[in-house]
């Protein structure tokens, strides 16, 4: 009887041990795996975020480029105006923004690729770890606990974000949920240690400890240093029945020791991807953009350069910076809005590819192709204008040369013998002449007495006056016929002709500058 009681007691102890062991078969708590599935879904947005970021920079570049071309279009039509100088100065400042944005785009593509690679790796690791727990079921028992710990959580896995990747044909531009991915880390992935990650008991044998060496015992020999690592460190068991989760909430603070892990690198690459662009902010108007440009050093430097180029001075000669800013941009950029209104309402030619002479308002031109055609049109118009001016100058020079060659003075100067000179009705021989003068010179008095007209050409008339002015002292050299210059009394009409020719040439040169 005693033996039977002892045997029954032994059996009860064994059954109790089995029940206790079975009761310790903990799965993974819903609050542990659900945020990781949510993070998986957010990380998979990275390709769309990268597309949005690169497109945003490209659109900013395009917006600035169109603004630049509109400013240059007005300046091309009125190249010598004060407005044109101002617009070219704004364009110079805008070019600095374009260069910075171009560099940002080049770097942005690299950031986009890196962020997408790291985020994809992290999302894949999270999904595969939780999928392993999902598949550890026989239809009755399970390793993923549902919310509330009372049932199987497998059915909720997909709805929480853990499902096979399926990209659309066209990536959707997206943005992150900042409750899941913040500027510091992954806020919902806070640490769960010891027994904090245990799900429903008696359901999952995955984290069962081996009672001895793994070679001869089932389970994991945690006492020997073995551990279970799911999702590249997202779920880790270093002790029996204790699935844990690392701290990934703040990589600059509490999760600093995780910064060099896959998840830390994924977050760092995402942060770099989200850096602000250099271009205009969404919704920024042309006037706002131009006012910001007017404040840049490059705009003021351009004004000084253009003024120096048109006057022959050096840029360092222009020192009154505030006065220059006020003159061209207005006090606190007050001239900018009126300038832009004038630009956008101006009608220009060249936008129509079929009819270049057709006019269009600058505000209606919103493609690079249209604006480039306008710039080409005015480039051709300027070229033709310069060619016509060069032709007119050459013609004028020829006419002046012809007039000088046919003047009475020139005809007399050709005679080198005194008898022949004296025989001419309009010439007289001068024995004593100054250096560079001819002996045979025109004599208007003799020509008049001989009945020869002395107003044959403009130059001839001037030479008649030259005879009157010749030899006079400074006191007697008076206008309108004579003018004292270079120590001698000269015909003022000849000086006027020379000044006229010089002014024409100067005007042509100024036109070439712009």
Curated annotation (Swiss-Prot):
Gene3D superfamilies the UniProt entry points to: 3.30.1680.30, 3.30.1680.40, Variant Surface Glycoprotein, subunit A domain 1 (3.90.150.10), Variant Surface Glycoprotein, subunit A, domain 2 (1.10.470.10)
SUPFAM superfamilies: Variant surface glycoprotein (N-terminal domain) (SSF58087)
Protein name from the UniProt record: Variant surface glycoprotein ILTAT 1.24
Species: Trypanosoma brucei brucei
Principal localisation: membrane
Disulphide-bonded residues: 37-162, 143-204
Renumbered residue ranges of the record's region Disordered: 451-476
Localization per record: Cell membrane
């Amino acid at each position: 009887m005693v033996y039977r009681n002892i045997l029954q007691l032994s059996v009860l102890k064994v059954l109790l041990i089995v029940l206790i062991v079975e009761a310790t078969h903990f799965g993974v708590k819903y609050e542990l795996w659900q945020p990781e599935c949510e993070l998986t879904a957010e990380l998979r947005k990275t390709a769309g975020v990268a597309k949005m970021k690169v497109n945003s920079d490209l659109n900013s570049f395009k917006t600035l480029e169109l603004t630049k071309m509109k400013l240059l279009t007005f300046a091309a039509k009125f190249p010598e105006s004060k407005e044109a100088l101002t617009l070219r100065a704004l364009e110079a400042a805008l070019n600095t923004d374009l260069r910075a944005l171009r560099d940002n785009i080049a770097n942005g593509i690299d950031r986009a690729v890196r962020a997408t690679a790291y985020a994809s790796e992290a999302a894949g690791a999270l999904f595969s770890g939780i999928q392993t727990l999902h598949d550890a079921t026989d239809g009755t028992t399970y390793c993923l606990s549902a919310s509330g710990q009372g049932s199987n959580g497998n059915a909720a896995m997909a709805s929480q974000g853990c499902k096979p990747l399926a990209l659309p044909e066209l990536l959707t531009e997206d943005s992150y949920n900042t409750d899941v991915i913040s500027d510091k880390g992954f806020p919902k992935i806070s640490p769960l240690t010891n027994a904090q990650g245990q799900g429903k008991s008696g359901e999952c044998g995955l984290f069962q400890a081996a009672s001895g060496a793994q070679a001869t015992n089932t389970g994991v020999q945690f006492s020997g240093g073995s551990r279970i690592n799911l999702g590249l460190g997202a779920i880790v068991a270093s002790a029996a029945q204790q699935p844990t989760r690392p701290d990934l909430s703040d990589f600059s603070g509490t999760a600093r020791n995780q910064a060099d892990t896959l998840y830390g690198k994924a977050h760092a690459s995402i942060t770099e991807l989200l850096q602000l662009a250099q271009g205009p902010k969404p919704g920024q108007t042309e006037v706002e953009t131009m006012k910001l440009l007017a404040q840049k050093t490059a705009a003021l430097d351009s004004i000084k350069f253009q003024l120096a180029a048109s006057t022959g001075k050096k840029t360092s000669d222009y020192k009154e910076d505030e006065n220059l800013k006020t003159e061209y941009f207005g006090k606190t950029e007050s001239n900018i809005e009126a300038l832009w209104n004038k630009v956008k309402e101006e009608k220009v030619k060249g936008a129509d590819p079929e009819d270049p002479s057709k006019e269009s308002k600058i505000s209606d031109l919103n493609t690079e192709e249209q604006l480039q055609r306008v710039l080409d049109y005015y480039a051709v118009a300027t070229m033709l204008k310069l060619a016509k001016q060069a032709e007119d100058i050459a013609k004028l020079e020829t006419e002046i040369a012809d007039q000088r060659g046919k003047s009475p003075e020139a005809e007399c100067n050709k005679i080198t013998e005194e008898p022949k000179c004296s025989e001419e009705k309009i010439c007289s021989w001068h024995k004593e002449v100054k250096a560079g003068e001819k002996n045979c010179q025109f004599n208007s008095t003799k020509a008049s007495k001989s009945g020869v007209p002395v107003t044959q050409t403009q130059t001839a008339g001037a030479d008649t006056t030259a005879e009157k002015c010749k030899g006079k002292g400074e006191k007697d050299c008076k206008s309108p016929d004579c003018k004292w210059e270079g120590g001698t009394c000269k015909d003022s009409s000849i000086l006027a002709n020379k000044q006229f020719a010089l002014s024409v040439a100067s005007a042509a040169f100024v036109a070439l500058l712009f």
